Amino acid sequence: MTQIVVGENEHIESALRRFKREVSKAGIFQDMRKHRHFETPIEKSKRKKLALHKQSKRRFRT
């Protein structure tokens, strides 16, 4: 769980910015998206295969 301690003279906007930065560092949003819907093993393998294909295309192009 990500926690931010807001200072006494700190603006809420800067605290919110720090919180967003910590959440993105921790990878919480990616994990949330990954677990949003149940994914069957076949769907998971298809997604991984497609990601490998895209990655190899990028490597080949450069």
Curated annotation (Swiss-Prot):
Cellular component terms (Gene Ontology): ribonucleoprotein complex; ribosome
Compositional bias annotation for Basic residues: 45-62
Domain of life the protein comes from: Bacteria
Residues spanning the membrane: none
Keyword Calcium: no
Stretches the record annotates as Disordered: 43-62
One Gene Ontology MF term: structural constituent of ribosome
InterPro entries referenced in this protein's UniProt entry, alphabetically: Ribosomal_bS21, Ribosomal_bS21_CS, Ribosomal_bS21_sf
Keywords for the protein's UniProt record, in alphabetical order: Ribonucleoprotein, Ribosomal protein
GO-annotated biological processes: translation
Family that this chain belongs to: Belongs to the bacterial ribosomal protein bS21 family.
Protein name stated in the entry: Small ribosomal subunit protein bS21
Gene name, Swiss-Prot/TrEMBL: rpsU
